[in-house]
Structures are given as C-alpha cells and as structure tokens.
A protein has these predicted regions:
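Single conserved hydrophobic/aromatic residue that forms the stacking wall/gate
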Residues: 156-166
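Glycine-rich FAD pyrophosphate-binding loop
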Residues: 6-27
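Glycine-rich Rossmann-fold phosphate-binding loop(s) that bind the pyrophosphate
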Residues: 17, 153-156
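Beta1/beta-strand and adjacent pyrophosphate-binding region of the FAD-binding site
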Residues: 1, 148-153
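Helix-loop-beta segment of a Rossmann-like dinucleotide-binding subdomain
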Residues: 42-59, 85, 94-96, 143-149
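Glycine-rich active-site loop/strand segments that organize a redox cofactor
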Residues: 22-63
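FAD-binding core/adjacent interface of flavoenzyme oxidoreductases
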Residues: 24, 72-146
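Helical element adjacent to the flavin cofactor pocket in flavoenzyme catalytic cores
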Residues: 60-77
Length: 166
C-alpha cells in the first residue's frame, strides 16, 4: 500500500507498534515459513538474493525482507508508535488517530493490523479439565507440549513439527 501511495505522490505514514514485521519475529512459532516459495512470495523490484527460488523463506528472513523492502522504498514508517484509537470525525471529513506519540488527523485510514489480534479458544473444553490449550500466538515449538496425545486445529505448520516430535 505504501509503495503505491508513494508512487502516486500521496503523503502518508505507516505506524508500527514495534519493529517492522515484529509479529514474524516474536509472535509466531519457530518453524514458521512463508506460504509460498521465494520466487512467488516477493515484492516487485526486490528478490531474495540469499534464498533459492523454490525455498519457502523462514520467518526471520521474511521479517528482514519486509524491512529491506521498506528501506528500498524509503517508506515513511514510524516504528515504536502504538495506535490506541481511530475515531471518525463528527462534523468534518476524516479521522482522529490517537497514538502513543500524540494525535494525528487523517482524511483516510488503512487498518492493516494482520490477523488474530486476540487469541480465541473453542468453547469445548472446560477450563478446569486439566487439558492444556495453547493458542498459536503463544506456541513456539513442540517442546512446550506435554507428553501424550495432541490435537492441532487448522495449522499444518504446527502439526508437522509436532508429529515429527512424536
């Protein structure tokens, strides 16, 4: 989005609560890789020089790639700025954005928060059952899991390393 806005000469800023791609770095499991191979999961004008075209880049490399791309574009990224509230203005166009560093007035806002901001657990297992439930946002590797049977809902990226562990 920033690339296209910049190319059209539209002034904008990108606010990042922490570093660029922080969730890739610290809020995902150890074995996470991109959803596609390097030849496919890339942006125009920036290839993965150190990753083979058919390799699915690991999360650390993806995070660095996003940083490299922002730098290449000279994108107006402000890191360490938390957006606390976005409110549509009442009697005038635009929005008031309240951040950890003050207030920003904007005509338009693009909310690109990414998925899964708040972990959700299926309401199947009673809390006092003694069964460990671990959301993917807290999962790092199979070493966190108790011995015994495991049920993984939806994530092959977590299921496969868990299966290999036994």
């Amino acid at each position: 989005m920033s690339e296209h806005l910049g190319a059209m000469g539209i002034p904008h800023i990108v606010l990042e609560r922490k570093r660029i791609a922080e969730r890739w770095r610290s809020e995902r499991w150890d074995s996470l890789v991109a959803n596609g191979p390097a030849w496919h999961d890339r942006f125009p004008g920036l290839k993965f020089d150190d990753v083979g075209p058919d390799v699915f880049p690991p999360k650390e490399r993806m995070a660095q790639y996003f940083e490299d791309y922002a730098r290449m574009l000279n994108a107006p990224v402000r890191t360490g700025v938390e957006v606390r509230r976005v409110k549509r203005n009442d009697k005038r166009p635009g929005f008031t954005v309240t951040t950890s560093e003050g207030t920003i007035e904007a005509l338009h806002v693009v909310a690109a928060t990414g998925p899964f901001q708040v972990p959700t657990y299926p309401n199947i297992v009673p809390e006092d059952s003694g069964i460990q439930q671990l959301h993917s946002s807290a999962y790092k590797n199979p070493g966190q899991l108790a011995d015994g049977a495991v049920l993984v809902l939806s994530l092959i990226h977590i299921s496969e390393p868990t299966r290999r562990r036994g």
